[in-house]
Amino acid sequence: MINVTKADGSKQPFEKSKIVRTCLRMKAGKDAAEEIADKMERRLYEGIRTKQILKMIFSYLGEYKPELKHQIGLREAVCLLRPKPDFEQFIGLLLKTEGYDVEMNRILAGKCIEHEIDAIAKKDNETLYVEAKHHYQPHSYTGVGVFLEAQATLEDLNDDKNNFTKAVVVTNAKLSEHAKVYAGCKNIGAMGWRYPEGKSLELMIEDNKLYPVTLIKGLDSTLLARLGDNGIILVEQLVRYGVEKLNKLTKVSKSKLKEIFNKANEIL
């Protein structure tokens, strides 16, 4: 039995089914996913790191889905977004695709103190106070403390006659077990990596094709900052702007932008 080394240094037995599931999430067919898993199983060695396994998956998937050679892993891509304003704007766009009217970055008075609110989302009779919690490390956990703070903020806001239906925490990390239990007990909405089942952050991104621009290989931090400063967070937005407009906004050469534009089109 081969053991793989996780990002935190711990080891766990290799599970072939995880390779298949990863390939399927990347829209590979079932036959292709199983064939890739078979190939990888023959190449693995004791202690191989999960990051190296992901690179191998992308390499093999590129034979079946050429567009994947232009992108990095989705989880890593979301981690590369700046917490403010990029990740917050990203969550705002996601909520809009779910039919919410969204207001970003409000300061509201509670009974005791003022609170900086990442987003307010309204739909039908529902008004959500949304907390966006970003992590740079892809294998971090969002702990119960974030949910304790969200609940305290909600109570202080509503004590001053605000009318929020509930608090919602959206994070690009997994949730700790204590966080899940507390969120369920206090009726706090929670969305994170692989949580909740069927409505997790990565599924929402994939189902709506809300791919962050950081997914595209070859974008340096300067260009990403210029795109973010102009509100361009998604691959779809980048394509919609086109090379000419992007050139005026970013001052990056048209030849470089055309290369990026072509990669973006293939991803979509």
Residue ranges and their predicted role:
Residues 15, 33-36, 71, 163, ...:
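N-terminal alpha-helical segment
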Residues 89-91, 204-268:
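C-terminal extensions
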Residues 30, 61-211, 228-229:
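Intrinsically disordered, low-complexity Ser/Thr/Pro/Gly-rich regulatory segments
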Residues 35, 107, 195, 239-240:
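Proline- and acidic/polar-enriched loop/turn elements at helix boundaries
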Residues 1-82, 87:
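Long, C-terminal-biased catalytic regions of enzyme "large/alpha" subunits
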